[in-house]
């Protein structure tokens, strides 16, 4: 993807945007929008128009941001302990052999599965206890209701 640069403002012009103007003498200009094209025809100096790239370069706008960005990118790494674990403990875990780590993981998984089985057994026991005292529910006697007497008279 070829990017053009606006002849007046200095902004990038992406394909499908902007306007190319070729003068009679063969010199070509590329403008990002009508505003920059009009300013060019009015012979305004882009170094004096505050929104152009040339103005920003002339008055060193945005230069301090780039410097601070570069300063921030140089970071030094320091090893510290995390809450609840000292640096020595962390390093010991890190330097463990893979076999030891795998064995510990398998043991933890086994313990978790045992705990899950225990919970399921307790649930089943509770269900069995609840089912034992089942008595036949008493049926309620149906109420006999009389139909209301028909209304005499009409609607009015």
From Swiss-Prot:
GO terms for biological process: cytoplasmic translation. Keywords: Ribonucleoprotein, Ribosomal protein. The keyword Ribonucleoprotein applies. It holds the Pfam family Ribosomal_L24e. The keyword Transcription regulation does not apply. GO terms for molecular function: mRNA binding; structural constituent of ribosome. Transmembrane segments: none annotated. Gene3D superfamilies: 6.10.250.1270, Ribosomal protein L24e (2.30.170.20). One of its GO terms (cellular component) is cytosolic large ribosomal subunit. PROSITE patterns: RIBOSOMAL_L24E. Residues 110-123 have a biased composition (Basic and acidic residues). Residues 110-156 are annotated as: Disordered. InterPro entries: L24e/L24_sf (IPR038630), Ribosomal_eL24 (IPR056366), Ribosomal_eL24-rel_N (IPR000988), Ribosomal_eL24_CS (IPR023442). Belongs to the eukaryotic ribosomal protein eL24 family. PANTHER family: 60S RIBOSOMAL PROTEIN L24 (PTHR10792), RIBOSOMAL PROTEIN L24 (PTHR10792:SF1). This is Large ribosomal subunit protein eL24. The lineage of its organism: Eukaryota, Metazoa, Spiralia, Lophotrochozoa, Platyhelminthes.
């Amino acid at each position: 993807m070829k990017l053009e640069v606006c002849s007046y403002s200095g902004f990038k012009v992406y394909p499908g945007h902007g306007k190319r103007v070729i003068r009679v003498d063969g010199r070509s200009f590329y403008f990002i929008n009508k505003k920059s094209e009009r300013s060019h025809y009015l012979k305004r100096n882009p170094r004096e128009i505050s929104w152009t790239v040339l103005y920003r370069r002339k008055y060193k706008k945005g230069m301090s941001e780039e410097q601070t960005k570069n300063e921030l990118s140089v970071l030094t790494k320091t090893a510290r302990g995390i809450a609840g674990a000292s640096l020595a403990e962390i390093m010991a875990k890190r330097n463990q052999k893979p076999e030891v780590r795998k064995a510990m993981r398998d043991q933890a998984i086994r313990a978790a599965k045992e705990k899950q089985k225990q919970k399921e057994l307790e649930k089943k026991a509770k269900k069995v206890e609840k089912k034992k005292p089942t008595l036949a529910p008493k049926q309620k006697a149906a109420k006999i209701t009389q139909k209301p007497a028909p209304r005499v008279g009409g609607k009015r």
